[in-house]
Amino acid sequence: GGVGPDAATSGGMGGTGGDPGAVGGRGNSGAAGGAGAVAGASGAAGTIIAGNGGNGGAGGAGYAADGPAGPAIGNGGDGGHGGAGGFYGNGGAGGAGGNSAPGGGTGGNGGTGGDSGAMGSSGGRGGDGGVGTNGGAGGGGGNATSYGTANATGGAGGDGGTGSTGNGGSGGDGGNGGTGHGGGGGPGGTAINYGAGDAFGGAAGKGGTGVVGGNGGSGGAAYNYGTGNATGAGGSSGSGGAASVPNSASTATATSGSGGAGGDGTDGGNGGSGGFAFTFGTGNIIAGVGGGGGTGSTGVGGIGGSGGGADINNGAFTVVPQGGAGGHGGDGATDGGAGGAGGFTEIDSSASVIAATGGAGGDGGSGGTGRGGTGGGGTGGGGTGGGGGVGINNGSGEAIGGAPGAGGTGAVGGDGGQGGAAYSYGTGDATGSAGAAGTAGTTGVGGTGGAGGAAYTLNGASTATATGGIGGNGGDGGTANGSNGGNGGAGGYASTTGTGTASVGNGGRGGDGTATVATGGTGGVGGNAHAPAGSPVPGVGGKGGNPGPGGKPGPNGADGIVV
């Protein structure tokens, strides 16, 4: 199609993409709209076998009446939608939104993929949002359907446009929001398969960044009604956008976006992580939560997304901060998905007097015939960490590990999450959180208790106490003969370089075996203590679980030692 002419207030319409001219050909892309606030045309549909849909035309740019440096008139035009694919064909990509100083245009949606049959097809990718004071939204990914033997894959959501001083656009890798909001992520496309192939939900867009970050988009769902080796997987979701307030005189709130939910499918998609939130100011801070895992209709549930971190760098900050909560693991027909870890909380200023508490871990999803999901441990006090989270407080307030998530239910009980760790570089106490208890098995063995979070005071002049978390109790065994109780979690390690006390967590109790010849779980090991100039108090090992009829009691856990 021809390019539309420029105009003072509205550009000409972009030409429509033509039909494909040969077998296996492709529809031509729609041409760009002229300068102004007009939309690009949509691509034409593929009309023959294996004909792909044409791409949507790009939206026109906002016209500058007084020259390139003058005020612009109108927002950028919207991108055209991608055309639908013909039989076996792929959907066309959505056109990008036009750029304009007042606001970028919205990206077009991806076209729907044709029946994939034996060759496979995909939905088109959503168009990216245009750049402007406020970024344009990214388009949604196209859907795809299959009745044959090949795969059907939903298209990815489009990226959000950059907001130079205002709002970031919706979509993956959204633009910076300046002083405004980041846009939400574009959703992934849905995939449906009635044949023997796979169905893959499309990936979602990420949220845009801003003082208020945009939420990640939801992953595309996948539905598989066929037979054979068909295993549909829900699309993973987008992460939440970051949020930053770099002005120490500001009282604004920094709110990062939440992660999107994983798509449902034969296997559930994973949830997106919450966005990171940072402030030099004295206003509030709200870290985004992790997205939940998708449901697995015949397989496993998706993993919950991690909570976003919260970082404060102003001693006058008075609102008690906390990292974002981890997302819930998705339920599964076989295994439940693991819960997401809680976000960290970090206080950088030595003048601060408030506590830093890590975010809570998400609960594990429920399983059917398989194992329940493992609960995600919260990250404590400030920094990042694997398993149990790391927390950092450089002020006089306490560093506290985040609460862990519970294990999911299942034939075999889910393991409890590990307690969040805590680090104090200032003069405050450090307290690791207790590990979560393992979940009882409905028919099988009980889940293992989570380990207690470690605690560290790392200031040689400090008299503060480091307290390791208590290990979680093991879950009881289920109804089937020989289903043993779960083991107790280990007590958290405690260490101080100052003259205070290092008090260590005790090991968790082993779960009971309730069925015939079932053995009780082993008690958790008591934590070790390290305090060269202070007072070390090692943890006591956990008691072993009680046996079922004809079984044996579980052994007690070993006591901790001074190291």
Located regions from the model:
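Collagen triple-helix signature
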Residues: 1-563
